[in-house]
């Protein structure tokens, strides 16, 4: 019985090592997908920020023109 335990323990040990390597590779693949989504989010955030800045500039210009009109009383 003792002679059977050593090979079984050895096979169990090899199986655990190979399983841990598979999990590490799978984790590395999943990390790449996460980075892509973060890059996409960053790009989307930049686009939204640029649109908001353009809208604010347009609104600010309109408000300044209205104030100038009120101050000059040329309306």
Swiss-Prot record:
One of its GO terms (cellular component) is extracellular region. Expressed by the skin glands. The keyword Disulfide bond applies. InterPro entries: Antimicrobial_frog_2, Frog_antimicrobial_propeptide. GO terms for biological process: defense response to fungus; defense response to Gram-negative bacterium; defense response to Gram-positive bacterium; hemolysis in another organism. Residues 1-22 form the signal peptide. Its main location: secreted. Disulfide bonds join 69-75. Keywords: Amphibian defense peptide, Antibiotic, Antimicrobial, Cleavage on pair of basic residues, Cytolysis, Disulfide bond, Fungicide, Hemolysis, Secreted, Signal. It is found in: Secreted. Residues 23-40 form a propeptide. Belongs to the frog skin active peptide (FSAP) family. Brevinin subfamily. Antimicrobial peptide. Active against some Gram-negative and a variety of Gram-positive bacterial strains. Active against fungus C.glabrata 090902 but not against C.albicans ATCC 10231. Shows hemolytic activity against human erythrocytes. This is Brevinin-2SN1. It comes from Sylvirana spinulosa (Fine-spined frog).
